[in-house]
Amino acid sequence: DLHPRVRRQRQMCIRDRKKAVRWIRSAAAVAAALVVLLGCFQIFRSLTPRDGQIPMAGAGAAGEAEVSQQQAQSPEDYSRVYAQIKELKEKERENGGDSYTGIYTPALGMDGIPEAGEENAVNTAGGGSPYDGSSAEKDYSDTNNQVEGVQEADIIKTDGEYIYAAVDGDVYLLRENGGNPEILSKIEKIDTVSEEGENICGISERINDIYIAGDRMVLIKYVADYDAYYDMMEDAAETDAAPANGCVIYGPPAGLAKYTAAVYDITDRSHPVLLNELGQSGTLISSRMVGDILYLVYSYYVPGEIDETDPSTYVPALYLGDAKTEVAADDIMLLGEPGAAQYLTVSSIDVGSPAEFLDTQSILGCGSDIYCNSETLVVALTTMEETNDVSKDKTELFRFSLKDGAVTMESQGSVPGYVLNQFSMDEYNGYFRIVTTENVTHYFNEGGIASAEQEKTRNHLFVLDESMNIVGSIEDLARGESIYSARFMGDTGYFVTYRQVDPLFTVDLSTPSEPKILSELKVPGFSNYLHPFGDGLLLGFGQNSDEESGEIQGLKLSMFDTSDPAAVAEKHSELLGKKYMWSNAIGNHKAILVDSEKNLIGFPAENEYMLYSYSPESGFQKIAQLTLEADGPGDMDYDLRGFYVDDVFYLYSPSGLAAFSMEDFSRISTLLWEE
């Protein structure tokens, strides 16, 4: 069985067409979506480099090159792009699909727009922002970033002097003010959507995430323009696609839904000034910021019918303010055998001067997870390798180089198995490391009766070079279990597999061609997240389970002694709360605060926020159990964050912001967003 996180992840590459503002009721439309899903699970084999790019080398499971080096397209020529998209669309129809216009939109929340913070929670490993500014003398926590120097977006940010909070699609800018935060300004979402029965009109916008870089603020937004969809359909009013009252039945297609990065000058926090808004049609897979450069990774499915004379019908749109254009032909690289009419696009923006995109690179394909450091971006896509009688998980890897905003597709490879999340990947000293879980299913047809049999899952670790050739591996580990968390730290890797107990594997990666298992520790439960906690210690956050039945029995903190990698031991553990207690941090690393210097471990537990300290002698100690309001939770907010500025600890909730003294965690103030 797939890990729950991976069930969602596998759908990400087609999520622009899986959900709509209203449930899709067309059987033909559902069939089309299923066809595209299968298409995304096909094998990608070859890439066509654009002018001036280094020819790529690829690797299959055995490390064999899979890349053909064909002539790049000229900037003005979309003919080969059109031909391949046309072929893919025809295959969809042949397999029972229907290019019904207007059913595919990006992944939506319960209210019809994406949930805030979904993309990617507080690196509270201490220290301030990497950006210089007036608050440099302040001591404050940062977002829980995977890679040092690479910022990840979140719903709450601070630079020590100010706090920036995304709340229900809006953004508040506040002066920190020593525990008595003062709202200075508010940026409101645009929402002109109206409903008449099943029909929807207007524009729906939601601010999902925030980046801060000195006096620049970037808001990651989702925008669905239903009116633009109707304008597009006006000339086809005689068809059933355009309702008589001028509204859209199912919502705009992916081509008219977009994610944007709105860049603001916040020199005066009381009056933020919009400098530009840049974006692309489709779904935002993820984003990262390195210095002042923002990198956006998109997936775009081509909806509806296509017209060779109109590239906007089969090429992703780029948005610069109110202007719209298509990705240039010479920025598109053709895959030899993509499974669906879908693009994967990486774009860059200089937030200091956001007049235009610095660079854009697009390939035919899709993605689900990314790993990013200051020089390299790797996009992973879990697919299926299928024959008539066997299907196997496979992860395609696309490696881009990043240099001052220039994005260059360098190499492509693949490994067996599916990837859990971004922490399953890492690059160190020029080598890319990845852990995967593989499902293998055999299909039988005896006497006209079809059946299937799944092998026990197997887990693998692979080391690849910069050409994405496999140079080292450890395969077939922990049969019947799945990877639940991973962390790479220099020459050492840690990963957790689980079925009934939690084996924590420690791997020596100092010789890339010969990785080896140093130790395997089995303890009850499993860690969903691993985080270094000073020298020789590794924190595990996850869930406890019964050793016999495997039944989940609440949350668990573990501290592992890693001072001797060959004899890793669980030094202390702490079981939390009731049997079915849940934490949003289980699936979102940004909801966890870990600061070994301040001896703080924070995370939400249902609708409360827990704070622990750790002692090598006595283990974990609970130091606070916080709620937004003094008389208890009072609401059902689960998407909580904790962060600190100097000696004030803040609890963020979708309902408000509470401040506490870090001396004794007594309440200083409570601010409710609605007041």
Residue ranges and their predicted role:
Residues 2-10, 14:
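Single conserved hydrophobic/aromatic residue that forms the stacking wall/gate
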Residues 15-65:
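Membrane-interface helical sensory segment of bacterial ECF anti-sigma factor regulators
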Residues 44-675:
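Beta-sheet-rich non-transmembrane sensory/scaffold domains
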